[in-house]
Amino acid sequence: MKTELNLFDRQLTLFRYPNNANETLQAWDAGDEYLINYVEELALDTPQNILILNDHFGALSCWFSAQHQVTMMSDSFISQQGAKENLQRNQCREVKLLTTLDAIPTETSLVLFQLPKNNRHLTWQLTQLRKTLSPDVPVVAVNKAKEIHTSTLKLFEKYLGTTKTSLAWKKHRLVFCQADCAQMNDISPVTRWNVEEHKMTLNNLPNVYSGESLDLGARFMLEHIPQDDNLKHIIDLGCGNGVLSVKAAQLNPKAKFTLVDESYMAIESARLNLQENVTASVDAEYIANNCLDGFAGEIADLILCNPPFHQQQAITDHIAWQMFCDAKRVLKRGGKLQVIGNRHLGYDGKLKRLYGDKNVKLVASNSKFVILQATK
């Protein structure tokens, strides 16, 4: 794994977060390099107030903090922690960290923008930029060229303003935009829809996974949520919009709940959904975190888990493995981890390695998914 970014006779040492010993993915990509090259070639003669959106692990924030005032906005707890560590590692100047739920800083003079994965999140960020920026503030975005579609550029033109693109470089392309389109009425960040068969109405902020409909895995898992008066503390690990906790709280109203996700928008969506869909006052805590880092051991009776297999733009299985390891530490003796995953992901083998063959059982399966339960 390459950890040294060398450009313009400068060097940064950059790691992903968490910094795993067997990590093979680097902490920046060619898109970061393209943005750095572009801005450096502008030879800006005065310090700028640079707003950086969706900086993966702080490469852009580290680079530009040397000469400019930098604000980094991200929906990712993991990205923010990675940026903090890389800023400290490289003895960089202080960078202001915000979530994408926060307001766009009014003093911004340049916006640099790693495009998010989903168009709902992109649309939200563009509308927030349009509300705040004047037309003379340049917005420069980057992504892999194959991910910048005509529909992507139409979103820029509709919600922000005049848009053009660069030539491709190392399979990446820049998008240049200025905030000059007609101001639109405020767009609600929340998408709402019903799950009739489970008597729920779910609120979804723009960057929540499967925010426009209930994903098939969660729908299957809802049919198999345990109901047991002995469940005192239930953790929803990788909670997303909190749909599993809503069902679990409806079935186990006396339990304490802890909902954990690395997305700030997921955490806020989960909070809204428990408040709206659980009639009794639920004892719940909502935590943006990297898995169960910092949690005490042997505190949970049940952990529900629908693991992601993406970190930023990369496909990886280390998140599921960390979740399973953390769950084993945090579960009480006799506590259970209940996991859903696609059949091809092989979670049964991972769980048996951790919990032992005889302690892992199949709860349910269909043509696409398996639900597994591991007992500590």
From Swiss-Prot:
GO terms for cellular component: cytoplasm. Its EC number is 2.1.1.174. It comes from Vibrio vulnificus (strain YJ016). SUPFAM superfamilies: S-adenosyl-L-methionine-dependent methyltransferases. InterPro entries: DNA_methylase_N6_adenine_CS, rRNA_m2G-MeTrfase_RlmG, RsmC/RlmG, SAM-dependent_MTases_sf, Small_mtfrase_dom. GO terms for molecular function: 23S rRNA (guanine(1835)-N(2))-methyltransferase activity; nucleic acid binding. PANTHER family: RIBOSOMAL RNA LARGE SUBUNIT METHYLTRANSFERASE G, RIBOSOMAL RNA SMALL SUBUNIT METHYLTRANSFERASE C. This is Ribosomal RNA large subunit methyltransferase G. It comes from the Bacteria. Belongs to the methyltransferase superfamily. RlmG family.
